[in-house]
Amino acid sequence: DEGRMALDEPLGFDWFPRARSPETDPRNEITLRHVLNMSSGLETVDNGGLEYATGSGLAYWAGPSSIRGARARALIREPGTFWDYENYDTLLGVYAMKLAIGDDQEYLEFPRKRLLDKIGMRSTLLSTDRFGDFIMSSQVYTNARDLGRFGLLYLNNGMWNGERLISEEWIDFVRTPAPATATTGNGYGGQWWLPGDNASGVPTDAYSTSGNRGQYTIVVPSHDLVIVRRGLDNPGGFSRWGLLREVLKAIPEETEDR
């Protein structure tokens, strides 16, 4: 939103292992849009059950650099054509932000100064790996009140107390189905989850974050509604859209004054 990054420009990274001719490395075609849509085309690591063996999970426990690991995957598909949920794709987006900011201290202060403090998310901690890089694919410690503030910012189209913190274009991006999900139900946008084609009885404009073990922030503009749910679930043990359906049942439908 500050004009430092563009969704459709190549990331411009140095990749590992280095190609004999880096300028012709096919990974150079990967854009910020691709990684935020979870469709980089890079090899599967986390989603293949290897998160804590060779994937992003190693960085959680003072292991290798999260960013170097994210840049060390081979390209196995054309970017933008196949959806695969990978923490490493998010970490590539974080690295792109670091390069765009260009100053380590500003990078570390950026989330709090430009977002968290402005909306009062004072109980939220964004962890880094041991090299000082944010692990924004995970390791974000927060509480329900802060998540509610985050959801309210999106419900208000990026405005907070009269100040625009997030552009409407960004909000449109995060709640637009990733092109690569067209064949699998359109259930994912830009780092946010969507009801998709198969969630009956759910407003089509709803969208939701999803944290480990059932941490959800659901935004429903058509009902002026934000729902925060905290949990400690086993994988697949809770339906955020089922929760939304039950909440909507409890809200009386508006009727015209007579």
Where are these regions (language model features)?
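Active-site helix/loop module of the DD-peptidase/beta-lactamase fold
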Residues: 2-42, 72-75, 102-138
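Stable alpha-helical elements in mature extracytoplasmic
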Residues: 7, 11, 15, 28-32, ...
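Active-site Gly/Thr loop motif
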Residues: 121-128, 171-226
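Solvent-exposed loop and edge beta-strand segments that line ligand/cofactor-binding
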Residues: 23-26, 77-86, 135-141, 209-216, ...
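Alpha-helical scaffold elements that line and support the substrate/ligand-binding pocket
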Residues: 1-4, 35, 70, 84-115, ...
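Structured C-terminal helix/loop/strand segments within mature extracytoplasmic catalytic/sensor domains
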Residues: 206-258
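Active-site-proximal binding-pocket segments
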Residues: 111-112, 116-176
